[in-house]
């Protein structure tokens, strides 16, 4: 069985509190890992972006402090600020998880993106598949 490189996306709306950020980031990541049958050893990296109104805790720190169901010390985490877009959704954390997955034929299997807690509005075309 071949390993192919792919990515899966996620987003979650949060309140600007450490508790909300930790709880929601861990929940989103658990769902990404579970729905896509991802193991820590197959993850290349996990990148987050946050809107500029999230100021109390970055999602990588939240994930390290919380419980996402995998050992998150096994792969790099990275955070950056989302571009500020007029009229854009507020209090959003977005994720891009790059990972290897098993593929019998070398094709990339369907990925299950995760949009939670109001972030479904960002990509209704992807959220509907879940």
Predicted regions and their residues:
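Terminal domain-initiation and capping elements
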Residues: 1-130
């Amino acid at each position: 069985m071949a390993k192919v490189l792919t990515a899966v996306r996620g987003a979650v709306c949060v309140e600007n509190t450490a508790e909300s950020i930790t709880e929601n980031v861990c929940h989103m990541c658990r769902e990404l890992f579970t729905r896509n049958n991802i193991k820590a050893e197959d993850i290349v990296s996990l990148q987050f972006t946050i809107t500029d109104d999230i100021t109390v805790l970055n999602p990588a720190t939240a994930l390290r402090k919380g419980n996402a169901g995998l050992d998150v010390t096994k792969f790099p985490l990275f955070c950056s600020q989302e571009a500020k877009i007029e009229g854009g959704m507020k209090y959003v954390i977005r994720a891009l998880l790059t990972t290897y997955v098993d593929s019998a034929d070398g094709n990339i299997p369907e990925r299950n993106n995760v949009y939670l807690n109001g972030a479904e509005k960002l990509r209704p075309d992807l959220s509907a598949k879940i």
